[in-house]
């Protein structure tokens, strides 16, 4: 009897010990980066940096991870990032060329098969974009059949992979969603495109059956871009209003979207992210302030994320300050001779067109200055104040040597891009702000419309 009790006790202890070891064993993330673009690589979980490693001159990095939770992570080697799945005890060795990021990315070591498969999923979706685009011209039934056939092939291939590789529930869930979500997003995009000619009204309800497969409240996917992209597309199609219809319906369209989010998503992280996205998208497109007031009132009744609410309110205030007739916001800049000056103290004897650029975006930079010089060839009544958004003054000055000089062009660099981007509501580098000679805002437009845009004196 005593021996039996001892045996039972020993079994319990061993079971507990094995479970403890399994839960507390280390994981490792290391590798080599060829042509590194940054001195650091970061491992993140849900947008929080868990670990950072210095990347040596030879491109080598190493991280030891204690008792890591199984799930979806991502790593950043700026300016790029990619997802990876880590299970407790994995030892992943990465190799990539930072110039050809995703295409060169390969994993070896414990846990590598699932991550190489995940990267292949992403790359295959990218390679299929042209084919998917060609399907958009089809009628609903043939379109769904084509998408379903492609999905069946992917699922069949994944089943074979699962047979040959041991995967836990979390890894399977992540990979299945990585396979399905882009295709389901394509269906939602198809629905949006067909709304305008009423094709959707005649579609059988079975067309939408894929929607039942996606839960909007999966915490593990709360920062997975394909998952969030799909939900955002779903919100577009929950309104009975056509996105391409009259602009005065745009407010109601977005109110329908946030109400759908409020009724369909209970996970606070996912809910706040989707609401934030919709709010930013709406505020940056809407031109009528009274509509923005209405939207903001309804948004704040739904959104409980204090940080997001403060951010959205600040965006609204900055948009209000950029209205026609107001003076351009007070931003501190640095001149070519490295003098600090506030934007409202820059003298101009002519109306000013403010443009923005980065030396990291070569094609945009070339296109921008080509448009400016083309404009000035026929119209010398305006000055261009070109604001660089980078932080390295010396590197900026080196780039200026290669930019054609013109007495109507002045160059500046932002002292604090974060502050400037918020005050200027700089959501893309194609934005232009037109003021009179004293800094009073006349109009806000896009660089692509510069050629046809009439600027009155």
Residue positions per predicted region:
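Short, internal strand/loop/helix patches
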Residues: 400-433, 437
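Non-catalytic, surface beta->alpha helical segment in thiol-disulfide oxidoreductase systems
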Residues: 428-431, 437-457
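Thiol-based oxidoreductase modules, predominantly thioredoxin-like and allied folds used
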Residues: 381-395, 405-417
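Short active-site neighborhood of thiol/selenol oxidoreductases, capturing the structured segment around
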Residues: 341-372, 382-387
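Bacterial Sec-dependent N-terminal signal peptides
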Residues: 1-28, 444
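A non-transmembrane, solvent-exposed segment enriched in polar/low-complexity residues
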Residues: 19-171, 189
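N-terminal "domain-start" segment that seeds a small globular fold
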Residues: 309-344, 407
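N-terminal targeting signals for export/organelle localization
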Residues: 252-324
